[in-house]
Amino acid sequence: MLFLCRASPLLQRTALSSPLRFFAPPKSSFNRTFANTAVRLSIEMETVDTSERLVQLRELMKRNNLDVYIVPSEDSHQSEYIAHCDARREFISGFTGSAGTAVISSTAAALSTDGRYFNQAAKQLDSNWTLLKRGLEGVPTWQEWTTEQAEGGKTVGVDPSVITAASARKLSETLEKSGSKLIGIEQNLVDQIWGDKRPARPNETVKIHPAEYAGKPFQEKIADLRKELKTKKRAGFIVSVLDEIAWLFNLRGNDIPYNPVFFSYAVITPETVDLYINDEKLSPEVKAHLGSDVVVKPYESIFADARALSVNAPLTENGSPMKYLTSNKASWALSLSFGGEKKLDEARSPISDAKAIKNEVELKGMRNCHIRDGAALSEYFAWLENELINKKSTLDEVDGADKLEQIRSKHDKFVGLSFDTISSTGPNAAVIHYKPEKGICSVIDPNAIYLCDSGGQYLDGTTDTTRTFHFGTPTEMEKKAFTLVLKGLIALDTAVFPKGTSGFALDALARQHLWRYGLDYLHGTGHGVGAYLNVHEGPIGVGTRIQYSEVSLSPGNVISDEPGYYEDGKFGIRIENIIMAREVETPYKFGEKSWLGFEHVTMTPIGQNLIETSLLSEEERQWVNNYHAEVWEKTSGYFKQDELTLNWLKKETKPLK
């Protein structure tokens, strides 16, 4: 049974503490890359003592008759990357990764996360926590762990604004089978513990994203959405996902680091357009851009309006109330305000689908910004090699990241970074989403692997590039692993497939060469990329997530191609290009279908001294040479007055023999 209740004031209670535990299968049943649960890093990640926070949380749970409390990572809009004020899971657990769910019972606490963060979580969680390594055989999901903790008719609570309605229903149904129940706690318990130390909610001003970059007026996008509503016979669409609102209205914001979005909701009906946003965020220019047809309402009033819309829904031909359409990412709180499933149709958002197919203006912008970004990366790697090898300079990982940002910022249309730069040397490169911090990060070792995953936000597009270099002499294993990863990148880059194929179906192409050696990587092969929007964009992707099988790739999709390989405590390798799906000509057209392939837009050299050429086929060797010739042609013009970078680029793009 699903219902909403209000939380009670904070009380105090004693917490139980136990050593950090791992749910992990025997070594033989998963990739040896992560066989050792002990984390061997050359830096010390900070571990936060969460004992007192858990004491306070359990007091609140007791006061509200809760036996288990769930703390997801997401905010009220189900954002992957969140504002600091919404980092509740990080606050309660000490784990800073972008993905994971914390579950706290009266006697235990668990944190579930995916393979990108196994090492990081193991280092950051203190002894109060059990780490659930998601996706490994024999490891319970956070839902299963919650159900175990709630056995015997216990009550589980969650803030309904930070969990989707679909997830809440599914968990509730599972709990009810054992006599337990899920309830919504409207006032977030972690917020009460955080108190006045919780960061303020951002309220940054919104800017217009002009048609010269957007490629389509927002009025046309709304007209297209209304056609969808007519086809589906729905009363309106409730928009709660932030990048969908930014894209729909051709606006950009700055409320979440690295993601140009702003806190808002929207309701689109056949006759009206309501934008729920704090008025002070809108300049006169933005209000003029929106025009008189867009009614601006206070951000928080969406919930009261939802109830009114539900009660006054238009009628169908048979006299029954029409349903509203909303994304399957909409929060449980929003769903409850509308009256739940009876009043709402939850589905993959048509805005998400439309946003993922870039128009020609957006595609041109993505090509252009990647050329500028590629030039910035070449300048950085040339500088870094010179500093390490010729000048014998001592540079740490943050020094490198800061220098790269400085170089990027010189380029036209640069707005900021698209995510925290992953500047990692040696064993730190094996931490997939590693974040160096000044004072505790490592000095870059010229005799070890250096992995740099970085990206920029430009007015005309978003970039995301990973390159792995070795400025000394790589080992035989490092060269073999790098080359197998490169072969996987080429396999996806050169794939030709019938229209209607999903990224789920293509994932094995990038892994096949590693698989032949019994190797693999525990992250997806590719994710969608926004156009001056979120660097991680759905609904498309290449990987084993089941949702990737539910949507096929289409011309205009922009995704990453980023296979990798990681040896815990030794090194990590990843090569990442951004590729765009497009129609291609084939000698035959079986079934009269259209056939698709990819165009790569990333223009940065691939570390040649890590390539074991004997492992490449002639076609793969030619691909590398053609790619490097293209990089030289498109970026060398930036270095007419920069002899250092020009010479480095010439060296790194010379043909393989």
Curated annotation (Swiss-Prot):
It catalyses: Release of any N-terminal amino acid, including proline, that is linked to proline, even from a dipeptide or tripeptide. GO terms for biological process: proteolysis. Its EC number is 3.4.11.9. InterPro entries: Creatin/AminoP/Spt16_N, Creatinase/aminopeptidase-like, Creatinase_N, Pept_M24, Pept_M24B, Peptidase_M24_C, X-Pro_aminopeptidase_P. It holds the Pfam family Peptidase_M24. The gene is ampp. It comes from Talaromyces marneffei (strain ATCC 18224 / CBS 334.59 / QM 7333) (Penicillium marneffei). The lineage of its organism: Eukaryota, Fungi, Dikarya, Ascomycota, Pezizomycotina. One of its GO terms (cellular component) is cytoplasm. Mn(2+) 2 binds at residues 453, 464, 576. This is Probable Xaa-Pro aminopeptidase P. It comes from the Eukaryota.
